[in-house]
Amino acid sequence: MTIGQQHRGTALITGANNGIGLELTRKMLAEGWQIIALIRSSFPSDDSLVSGAVKSKQLRIYKADLSDFTALKRALNEIRLQEQQVDLLFNNAGGSFPELLYSKQGRELHYELQTVVPYIITMELQALLQKGQLKTVVNTSSNAAMTVRHFDPETLEHPTKFKKLLGPYAASKLALSLWTRELAPQLAAAGIMIRSADPGANNTLRSGKDSGLPFWLKPVMKLFFPHPSHGAGLLYNAALGRHSKLPGVFLIKDQVTELKFAEYSSKVLSKVQAIYEQEFAAAGRLG
């Protein structure tokens, strides 16, 4: 009996329609999981597994630009109205961008999408997680976090410098893992396990998409990096594998890894918490 068969339930996956998120969705659908997909764009139209799951309602789709608080709030409200429970939450949406970009709220896009939004989704779906059996959150981080040499939480919203992959992207992933570490004891007291995990190097190149990868990395990725199912497996194991009872840990290659700049974890958590309580709470209000 596989892990999935033992723990079959309902998983919510952000960024479920491409790359690692798509492979995680396909893996879990094949094992009989119910999947809630929170995505910005559509699934591939030629994927028979996905199409069949949509028709049978094993896969239920909610669409929003996650970096737009008004759209995100609307989608999360719909999920809370329509869904009964969430056993596993995979905060997986994100990516590396080719330049400094900003969200509708005015913050740097890597930080908004990959640090702030996972916190918002986790907070907003706590009630559904409490109704689930597994009550587990996995935040998709990156080993790029370990390359950060200087870290200042005050510059995350409006960085003054940009470097592909190793700049705001890496800082946003480090910040994600830091607040995950800091929040974990509070959630564990409520019965919810949260941890962050690096899905490893995967060939996630998409034709026609301008990525934030350094030019030299693209041919290396194409030739040598494994299929995104590799990363999906690592995220799956982060939720259900041997570390499933450990709150707050950061996993690289399924190994617990010490975070750099852990002294800033409370400050990062305070920042994302303030954005959630002040800005997100007011999103979508008239006047």
Residue positions per predicted region:
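Conserved glycine-rich cofactor-binding loop
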Residues: N17-N18
